[in-house]
């Protein structure tokens, strides 16, 4: 005989349901990739990635402010290192005035609380 009462202890009230639910995504869960290039006034869409752009440092400022205002608090920075600066050891990654270092400084100047992650991206070397 099938039971008349179904004991759903994990669904008995909202507090328990919210505790055991599988997934909830919020802006805090997202990491936004930022692609940075040398130059001024650059915001070029990446053809293979619709709605993603390459930013110069000056246009990066506005993007970081926008992301923060939307509640997005983490970014992952990728830079396009000029071919002339590439070598077998990836020494540009250690340049204190390199594009990556300047990009991180720009982001932190605009939004000190932004979580910034970087990718040295040695694969193009």
How would you describe each model-predicted region?
Residues 43-55, 72-98, 125:
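Glycine-rich, proline-tolerant flexible connector loops at the mouths of alpha/beta enzymes
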Residues 1-21:
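N-terminal amphipathic/basic leader segments beginning at the initiator methionine
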Residues 27-30, 70-74, 111-114:
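Short, well-ordered coil/turn segments that N-cap beta-strands
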Residues 9-13, 27, 53, 57, ...:
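Generic structural signal for well-ordered, non-membrane alpha-helical segments
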Residues 25-52, 117-125:
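N-terminal small/glycine-rich loop or linker at the start of catalytic domains
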Residues 86-120:
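Alpha-helix-loop-beta-strand connector modules within alpha/beta enzyme cores
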């Amino acid at each position: 005989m099938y039971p008349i009462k179904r004991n759903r202890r994990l669904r008995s009230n909202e507090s328990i349901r919210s505790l055991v639910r599988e997934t909830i995504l919020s802006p805090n869960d997202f990491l936004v990739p930022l692609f940075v290039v040398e130059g001024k006034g650059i915001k070029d869409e990446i053809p293979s990635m619709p709605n993603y752009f390459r930013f110069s440092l000056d246009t990066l400022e506005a993007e970081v402010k926008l992301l923060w205002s939307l509640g997005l608090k983490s970014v992952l920075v990728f830079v396009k290192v000029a071919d002339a600066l590439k070598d077998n050891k990836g020494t540009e990654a250690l340049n204190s005035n390199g594009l990556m270092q300047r990009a991180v400084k720009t982001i932190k100047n605009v939004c000190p609380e932004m979580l910034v992650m970087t990718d040295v991206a040695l694969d193009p070397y």
